[in-house]
Amino acid sequence: MTTKMVSSHRLLTLMVFALLLIPMISGQSSKCTKGCTSTPECNIKCMKKGGGHCQAYIGRSHGRLAIENYCCCNNYSNSPISSPVMN
């Protein structure tokens, strides 16, 4: 009985670990920085990573709702398919 519980616990732990590790290994997570005014500006800033986009996030600042724009870069620098060809 205890071996069944231990093995199922290990399997569950391994599955959670794998689900957390996959996005980090693939490099598909986007890095976001504060202060985006437009998507073209963000694209230029993120050119080496395959482009980017402005993303608005709603959060609380000093007890009030605040909307802040972030520049989120696509992390496609290791992918030969998604990377733009620069001459």
Swiss-Prot record:
Residues 1-27 form the signal peptide. The keyword Lyase does not apply. One of its GO terms (biological process) is defense response to fungus. The keyword S-adenosyl-L-methionine does not apply. It comes from the Eukaryota. It is found in: Secreted. Keywords: Antimicrobial, Disulfide bond, Fungicide, Plant defense, Secreted, Signal. Disulfide bonds join 32-73, 36-54, 42-71, 46-72. Its main location: secreted. One of its GO terms (cellular component) is extracellular region. Belongs to the DEFL family. This is Putative defensin-like protein 84. It comes from Arabidopsis thaliana (Mouse-ear cress). The lineage of its organism: Eukaryota, Viridiplantae, Streptophyta, Embryophyta, Tracheophyta.
